[in-house]
Amino acid sequence: MENLIKQYDELQNIYGSKELNSVYGYGKRHNPKIALVFMNPTKRNIATNKSWTGLKAQWLGTKQIWDFLTKCGLFSADINDEIKAKKPSDWTYEFCEYVYKEVENQGLWITNLAKCSQDDARPLPDEIFVKYSHLLKKELELINPKYIFFFGNQVSSIMLEQQISVNTVRKKKFTLDINNKQYDSFAIFYPVGNGRFNQSKAIDDIKEILKK
């Protein structure tokens, strides 16, 4: 994983904001139940700040994603309540570790396809995501998840190497082949930001998939 982090940092200097740190996948390191793959980080994540010396994981200092995972039954409601009560500046290094200990306990690995932190949430072109796809495959191979959830049309299309419209493939199982090992994968509605209007569909689909 350390070699991947080095490569992610190099790509940050090419495709990300020069004022921000890259952030990485984190959670249950070995054999997680689910790998959750989002798009790319922005400076809303407090760990992207150059002065940050704590955990460099996804969604730190934000609220929407933790509320979403709680509604999916994949995160502690009590810890989510603590998050709701905090401003980004209230997130200490210790609290970030505490949040991701719960992620680990839930059997999750949370990552982004692109690790290049941006100043805002404007979408990245496909070409940049493609630069990260082989690295994400190595990351997924290392952690060996039971299921992979790709969030949004763009991430799903690039990683599954076919044109995906989540609305037409809800709950459909795809197979991602990495070095002759097959991983059960699903395309899920992007649940936050501009995708928040589809959040209830994403929750319903995840709950249904995990029942099987």
In which residue ranges do the predicted regions lie?
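A hydrophobic alpha-helix/topogenic segment detector
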Residues: 14-15, 171-212
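A polyanion-binding, active-site-adjacent surface
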Residues: 2-147, 153-162, 166, 184-185, ...
